[in-house]
Structures are given as C-alpha cells and as structure tokens.
Amino acid sequence: WQLGDVAILTSVFYRFTIAAAIMLALVLLSGRLQATSKQDHGFMVLQGMCMFSLNFVCVYTAGLDISSGLLAVIFSASTLFNAVNSRIFWGERPTRVVFAASIIGIAGLSLMFWPELKADSAKGVNLGSIGFAFLGTSLFSLGNMISVRHNKKGLKPFTSSAYAMFYGALFLAALLIITGTPLTWDSQPHYLGSLLYLAIIGTVAGFTAYLSLVGRIGANKAAYATVMFPVVALGLSTVFEGYAWSLSSACGLGFVLLGNGLVLGIKLPFFARSKA
C-alpha cells in the first residue's frame, strides 16, 4: 500500500518524519532525553542514514519488482551480515550456534515463501532489485553496529533513535530537494492507515524494542528477530485473511522455530560445546 502513486522517497520521508516527531515528543515529555556529545551526534547522523532512511529507500525500491517473500528471505540475511560486521567492527567472533541458527532460519523462510520464490524465478527477477534488497539489508546491519556503539557509550535507544530518526528525516528531505521529487499525497484511506501503522508500530515501537534487544543480547542474536517478523505476519494473515498453510510452509516454520530455539539457548548435541 506504500508502493503506488506516491514516490518511494516521499513515502519514506513521510514515515520517518512522523516517527521522529513522535519519538522526540516522547523522550522530551518523559524526561528520558540523555545528554549527548558532538561525536554521539556524528554517529547518530550515520545511523539515521543507514537505518532510518537509505535502507528503506532500497527495500521499497526492491519491492517494486520482487515479491514480499523474497524480500523477507533476503532481509533475514541480516543475521549473517551482523555476525560478519560484529567481527569486523567489534572483534566479536560469531559462534557456531549463531551461524547455524541463521542458516536454518533463512532456509525456513525460503520454504515458507517457496510459492512466491518460484513465481519470481519463473518471471525472471531483476538482478538490480535483488541488489537493492541486499544493499538495504547491509545498511540495516551497519545501523546495528552503530547501535552497539551507542550501547557501549551508555546511550539508550530512546535517545539515540529519536535523534537518528530526526537526522534520517532531514537526510531524506535533502534527497527530495536534490532529486526534485515532489511531495505528493495519496488520498486513499489505506495509504494513510498503512503509513501511520508503519510509522508508529513498525518504526517507533518496533525499532525501540529491537534496538533495546540489541543492547541486551547483542546484535548477532537480536538480528534473528528479522527472521521472526514475517512468521508473525503470516500468523496474523492466517487469523484475519485465511492464509492456507502448505506442507512446505509448515516445514519452514519448524526450521524457523528451531533456529529461534538455538538463539535462545536450547542445547542440541552437535552444538553442546558452543555458547549461544
């Protein structure tokens, strides 16, 4: 519903302008805004570009040509991106359990969305769109690494996300001006409804919860949430839209839950000597 008459850049700008306004209002009214340094703001600008602007422009652009199922599978690769980037930026060696859970989760999502993946394969998917999806995923992972930095400096997600969303919205505004993209609007109720849902639930609530998780259990384990998001979406679709489960989707769910169990610390014989 966000991919229609309104330009992608404009829709993403609306989303993060609304989200930034809500986040800043919340931290100011609750008195939870922390003191920050110039260096902190430099990193929050980078986080805004990686996690709250460019990555979504890339993902939305990819969504014009490839299915939501393929997007979900590609985005779940953030578990692997985070494992590699944690090693590069923070010297954290990813465990065998993290890699195993990531591969199992991605395989599970592939099975769950197998019909969509087959359809994409049959029609011939634009490699450029797949590239945009992977670029958006890699930018999201870099945003995770910056969040780890904030946590090490004692910055809470409420403060860092509020500023980062604000900077992300400013960056998007600059892109709108540079590219000459118009601020058009879709008067259909579903456009406003989906925009508010994505801004409030998907961004303010979702990212605050996710980045809090990054601070508590680390970026490697927290990234597995990106595997669970589409599973929850399919669960809601089952209840409200009558989604029909197939053998492949049921098996895929089993793989995803197995991967989630590994991340949460369930011990299997082969991984008994590894720490999650």
Go through the PLM ranges and name each one.
Residues 1-5, 64, 113-126, 177-194, ...:
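Membrane-interface helix termini and inter-helical loops of multi-pass transporters
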Residues 2, 11, 15, 62, ...:
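Hydrophobic/aromatic residues within transmembrane alpha-helices
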Residues 4-54, 81, 138-146, 161-180, ...:
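Transmembrane alpha-helices of multi-pass small-molecule transport proteins
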Residues 10-21, 51, 59-102, 136, ...:
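Specific alpha-helical transmembrane segments that line the substrate/conduction pathway
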Residues 12-17, 24, 114-115, 191-193, ...:
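C-terminal-most transmembrane helix of multi-pass membrane proteins
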Residues 12-14, 71-77, 146-169, 199-239:
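Helix-helix packing/entry segments at the starts of transmembrane helices
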Residues 24-75, 111, 199-217:
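Specific transmembrane alpha-helical segments of multi-pass solute transporters/efflux pumps
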Residues 33, 77-138, 179, 247, ...:
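Juxtamembrane helix-loop boundary signature in multi-pass membrane transporters
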